[in-house]
Amino acid sequence: MGNKSKAYKAAAEKIDKGRLYTPLKAAELVKETSSKNCDATVDVAIRLGVDPRKADQLVRGTVSLPNGTGKSVRVAVFAEGEKATEAQAAGADIVGTTELIEQITAGTIEFDVAIATPDQMAKVGRVARVLGPRGLMPNPKTGTVTNDVAKAIAEVKGGKISFRVDKASNLHAIIGKASFDAEKLAENYGALLDEINRIKPSSAKGIYVKKVTLTSTFGPGVPVDPSIQKNYTQA
């Protein structure tokens, strides 16, 4: 633990907390200060000027990151018959409905994304209390309730992520791995921020993107200038 603390402290000293970095410089610092023991995941935390208690200010959506997440995504698909066959052919990791629901209820299965065909949603509703709090409930708004299961699987495995503002007006998302080039991390961040800006609620007042922090697993946070909303790969 002591070594970790020393390593973290040394990494944190490289970051000027009183400065707001460009997305590219922040990505470079995240890479430089990430753990050397693993290929750390790079996350972004964004504070939005919205009131998520108001339905029209609940910011949520999806975006396909141009460079993917670098993460192997385990996909479960609720489907039967022909659609189940399509899902298996498209590379789904788990396919089924009744047995899958039983495994979810028993807590014996893990996956990162759930997709369902519309005709299976009544059954999926039985495990909504388990999937909902974990952000795994299929939803038409995120493209995870669909008859085109092959397309949905390809998008998710290719780097499509979902995001949603929480009760404290914060939004968290994975934008890659520490092994990515800094430019690729900045491009992924830019794609996410562009989509967040595109779906800005019309009722949101004042500054919309208030605070941005990039961080790697076990690494210190790097403050990003939230006013930079284009030319993300410029130093």
Swiss-Prot record:
The keyword rRNA-binding applies. Transmembrane segments: none annotated. The gene is rplA. It comes from Corynebacterium diphtheriae (strain ATCC 700971 / NCTC 13129 / Biotype gravis). InterPro entries: Ribosom_uL1_bac-type, Ribosomal_uL1, Ribosomal_uL1-like, Ribosomal_uL1/biogenesis, Ribosomal_uL1_3-a/b-sand, Ribosomal_uL1_CS. One of its GO terms (cellular component) is large ribosomal subunit. The keyword rRNA-binding applies. The lineage of its organism: Bacteria, Bacillati, Actinomycetota, Actinomycetes, Mycobacteriales. Binds directly to 23S rRNA. The L1 stalk is quite mobile in the ribosome, and is involved in E site tRNA release. Part of the 50S ribosomal subunit. This is Large ribosomal subunit protein uL1. One of its GO terms (molecular function) is structural constituent of ribosome. PROSITE patterns: RIBOSOMAL_L1. One of its GO terms (biological process) is regulation of translation.
